[in-house]
Amino acid sequence: MAALVVGVVLGGCHSNAQTAQSVDPLSEYHGLYTPSNTEAFQASMHTNHPDYDWGVWGHNLAKLVKDGATDDMYAIVDGKRSHKQFCFSSQSLYNKVREYVLDQYGWGTADYSERISIMPMDNKTACTCDDCTARGNTSTNATPAVTAFVERLAEEFPRHKFFTSAYHTTNTPPTTSLAANVGTFVSSIKLPMRVDFTKTEGYNEFVQNVKAWRKQCSRIYVWDYERNYDDYLSPFPCLLAMQARFKLYRDLQVQGVFVNGSGDDYSAFDDMQTYVLALLLDNPDTDVHESIARYYREHYPQTADLLTTYYWGLEQRAQSTNHLLPLYGSMQEMCESYLDVKEFVSFRSQLDKASKLTVGDERKRLNALLTALAYTQLEMYRTGLLAKDEETIGEMREILKGHSELKGMNNRDESGHSIDDYLKKWE
């Protein structure tokens, strides 16, 4: 799952040293990987960002090791050495990580610590060398060796916090309790993206997994998702679904959440959604509709009513139908779930006309949104959801070409497919 790889970071920030036992639910980490979660936004809304507040982030050991890797750092898979996975019993690997932590962040202090992620490479292989097998590894379970590696670091660097992941070969919890400065990310990928997910198998599996890890690990973060990763430019009404998820995490005593959005890439309605998500992480009982309306009144004074009415209508439709919101979905799937073609075309047209009466920051924001929505309408034409209209298609193409003048609007999805390449398909 590529969504667990994004944002590979080597860097770090200063954070207050804190034990997991002192942390209230959802109070320790509010990570938002979205383009609107800027440094200024983080300061005003108390959010976090992986580029700024992790010493090592994601599946990043390969970047850390770099050219200093030796053969014994890599796993034995099916009896052969594989450079696609690490051996977490390797003394050389431990020495390399230890050296990096000490060189970059030192021992930490009572007031300074780093969050450091120690995760296997993002695949389903596990090392079964003699040492890893002796620790309890199997071909499908790397938890024993990985947690032993992390525990060793945590003991040597008690001021820093070390995180692993409940994902792929480390999904199974350890059999012994982990230190207070060790945490784990539990992926919510199997928790269906819909407003009411409580009657699904994925819900039961997720809850059981969090509770199982909770027995052995006192610091639990959730790695969550809030975007259609196949289409950043089209509307994605995730806020009521995210509110339901955050309420669940609070009930499960989860201390932190990382919400994986579109990273640095522009996505439709992201500025408003990032604002509301930040409020919901502070208080999952926040009134979503009022928060949306308040944001638009402040930042889009001339078009606030139009934007609020349309977007809230999408959220209400997603709630009333309880249809699955596709994390990887086509235009047809989005229209089956929440988009109404005629309603969308009418909204985009009205917004375009209204935008011409705006000035300053509102005009700039609307220009970006209308550019993104031109892609949505082109996709409706391309997939046959709209009858071909060469004049309007030409107009949408010209609008979308303006993406090159806008910050962050180069890619249309997680895989990095460019808008320019998409436009070439229309030539």
Enumerate the language-model features and the residues they cover.
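Acidic, His- and aromatic-enriched active-site or binding-groove loops in soluble protein domains
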Residues: 27, 31, 137-153, 180-199, ...
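Structured mid-domain segments that build the active-site/substrate or prosthetic-cofactor binding neighborhood
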Residues: 92-95, 204-305, 309
